[in-house]
Amino acid sequence: SLCTGMRINEITALRWSDIDYVNNVIHVTKTISWKAGGGVMETTPKSKTSKRDIPMNDTIKQVLQKQKEKIAMVHGEIFARKLDSNVFIGANGTRAIASATVGYSIDNVLKRLRQQGIIIERFTHHAFRDTFATRYIEEGGNMQTLKNILGHSSLAMTADLYSHVLPDTKQQEMKQIENAFTGVAVL
């Protein structure tokens, strides 16, 4: 989520067949929902625009490679090569890891840090998605492209959520336009 901006239930639904190393993209085509009585249900993403391709960079490829190596070490090489298996699975080899498990893991890490005197405010896995979006904008990423990566249904939604990141935008853009007209005669 921190490197892709994906929703947690999109990550938990991710299969090795969704990883396209030829075109360097992750195909987001499904999400995991948890039934009220327990159990997993695979569904289509929450909106038409949630079904999307996310570009992969080298960091994402390294994370995926380490995950594949971890699965091979714990569950065997044959299991790790199955294209229809989930990328992130439970310790017992179950099909998908629960989003609650991710939250529990975050809480455990924060607890261990507190024991070492390092206090970090509690956060949820959605903070990784927000951090991705914030850093993307801070690094000059285009808002329309961010909308597509995040799978938002409208540009307005993306702008409403993340425009606070750009407090000096008007000033910066006036400088850019000034630079564009440097040396041009003014009438």
Please provide the spans of the model-predicted regions.
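Short, basic (Lys/Arg/His-rich) helix/loop patches that form interaction surfaces
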Residues: 4, 54, 70-86, 91-148, ...
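C-terminal secondary-structure termini that scaffold catalytic or DNA-interacting sites
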Residues: 23, 34-51, 58-60, 73, ...
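Short, polar N-cap/turn motifs at the start of nucleic acid-interacting alpha helices
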Residues: 18-25, 141-161
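Generic recognition of well-ordered alpha-helical segments
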Residues: 58, 62, 66-69, 104, ...
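Proline-centered turn/helix-capping motifs that create local helix->coil transitions or kinks
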Residues: 21-30, 37, 66-79, 115
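Catalytic-site neighborhood detector that most strongly recognizes the C-terminal catalytic loop/helix
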Residues: 32-34, 131, 150-176
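Short, charged phosphate-coordinating catalytic segments
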Residues: 1-32
